[in-house]
Amino acid sequence: DDGLRERLLVIVGSDKRGTIYGLFHLSEIFGVSPFVNWCHVMPVHRDEVRLSTDMACIAKEPSVEYRGFFINDEWPAFGTWSEHHFGGPNAKAYEPIFELLLRLKGNYLWPAMWSARFEDDGPGLLNAELADEYGVIMGMSHHEPCLRQGEEYKYLRGKDSIYGDAWNFKTNREGIIRFWEDGLKRSGKFENVITVGMRGEADTAIMGKGATLADNIELLRDVLRTQRKLIQENVNEDLSKVPRMIALYKEVEAFFYGDETTQGLIGSKELCDVILMLCDDNYGNLRTLPTEEMRKHPGGYGMYYHFDYHGWPTSYEWINSSYLPKIWEQMTQAYDFGVQKLWIVNVGDIATQEFPLSFFMDLAYDFERWGTTAPNTTDAYTRLWVKRQFGRLSEVQQAQIADILTDYTRMIHKCRPEALRPETYHAANYREGSRVLAEAGRVMQTAQDLYDELERDAPEILPAYVALVWYPAMGTMNVLKLQLLSGMNHYLAEIGALSANDYAKEAKACLDADQKIIEQYHRSDDARWYGMGLSQHIGFTNWNEDECKNPLLMQVLPLQKPTIIATVDGTVQHVEGSPWLNQRMTISDFLNPECRCASISLYSRSELPASFRVIEKPEWIVLSAMDGTLDGEENKRLTIDVTVDESALAMALTDGRTQGMIRLELPAGICKISVPVDRSTYEYGNNTFVDTQGWIAIEAEHYSRCKDGFDREGQPMQWKCLAGYGKTLSAMKAFPTDSYADAENGAPYIEYSIVTKQAGDYEAEFYMQPSNPVTTENRLQYAVSVNGVPMQILDAVTDDFKIGDHQPVWARGVLDQIRRRSVPVQLEQGINTIRVYPVTPGFVLEKIVIYPHGNKPAEAYLGPTETYRCRS
């Protein structure tokens, strides 16, 4: 009847999962977070909830059919956690994980597998039965075919076993077939995406090094034929009703493509209806992607992505170090290339990955909202995510949390915790170490201040805040501080400054804080996360934690005479003033017409009182101290700010330039510090970079012109800025992301205007995202044209570029999160233009540094800071 109809709340799904999604969508409308049970994110109390007819909706089909995550590398963290709370990875442990997956609108899961047996640990089949009840589609990892895990074979194998004692399809064919067959009989009745193919045990290649490519391909073809028959016999004769997937992971990718002399598995009938799961390089950079012809494959394509990895060159497993703009850039490109059937991400232990996992799942579920047509929306997503978890807090507090999440992930993604070294960031050049140290300190201070506020005013919110924000931010930034302080200690120790010992003390305090932060996380929320912080994460010297070490700290012993050493901050210049050695330094900061402040630092090298005084300087140079005494104890260091009296300077300028000299008397002698100044008025166009310091450094988004164009097919193509992307400011990338361009025939370009003092030979160094070629042709090309002369087609990688273990060029790129390529260019005196064109997909430009040949600017992890540019 009509009256009853008006009082009905109807939730209908096309299947069980659809109905569950509807229920959870309703809970989100009520303000319930997907992490309500996983992280105890408690919703706002309401006495009543009102529904209105305008809330009625029909959900669209998800953008990606199979969306999920992989629990991996689970010891010691996830393994200890599950043992401590549930007695192991059993159904009690998986129940909250299944719920979390569904609340995130996922449907697909690879279970833990290092020492776990999902189908046995329930106990028995209880894990699988519970997954089926929840509507979770199960799969097994890239090297675990036919619904059986590697640990199962390890447990069941033996000389008297019906499955034999060798994971070898050639020597133990019948045993392996029976092992697979029994797995299909046991678990094929549940909803699965069945992994097919075969790799070696424990994530290795299936055949030895002596096997040829053809040998491997033929073996894999035999395996696939056998598995196809087994699935028909034991699951469903109609294979169109049985989703199957092969992971083209590591060496399997080569078996799929073959080479110029060996036909690979591409296009083979054994794979005609199988999902082809492509992979990243384990560090968040896509490997090959489907060509336009390949996209016709009936089975569709998947992507295996990583937020966690256990492997060469350096594992990263402790705390989230993935950055949303990078995830967006890579996964939107995957989708644009037709990878739309299956997405799965390795989340390690799950804990601390909740933030990027949410984005990954939302991107897969609703690509229209968050995908390629919505660039630069990760900040908006972050604010929305924070509101979902912490809507009870004030807008100011929510904004602080959003900043913490963005800042800590941006900073730790530049170099993951395990790969950080004291020398990663330069302790002196461009003030890099001190700049990053200050930024890390700000993040930690904000996170701790907010913790204190919540502890006082809203303790019920504290458990979720600790799990989702405080612990990952404090943990990663503290390790970053530890390595930065150690680097400062090393640098100052090398020049004999006693302040090095203070940095050593601060570094030791960070090391102590590391354990305290983890212990606080483990105690939080009634020890809910006990075990999740146990992964080693400091000073990896090998690919794994073996022989990892805390930073080496140096102690400086005081000299037995009064001694001061002077430095120019932002450089490695240092002098004592001795007449027998170099007495001169230069403050070049004021060669940038926008610079208004520089500094000199004085350091004690002795515990005896040592005096200094400025005995000469021009009137226009203003110093924050003219004399003083250091004693190596209470006063070990003094920083003297150097500024300019602009009115006095104006009287000294000739053609906008001048140079002053500071004569500083130290115990060992006179230090002479040159201070050249440029206050010229450069009347060039907006974003014209002028060489005032001997080199030019350009952030990619500061182009003088950006011209749209066309791809090879005549379709519109354009450059877009990716805000916040990369290691410094942002990046530029051409869209559509799957388009190829002819640089000499209508391609879009970005143009940079630069002014040089002299004509001659220069180097242009391009800083690029460490992308990989999207095809086996091994090309990642862009083009450069200088002053309109014939352009150069350049390649970001060499002809012999390879991805994988013991490939140093690739490894350097993924560890440093940058790839650099220098190109010789001829520049004229005065204004020059450099145009950059896309050629192949995947090229992402972050920075350009230009310098005279043979005069490269000082090195630093982030590269030289941006130099002077005209602003209109």
Please annotate each region the language model reported.
Residues 593-872:
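Extracytoplasmic
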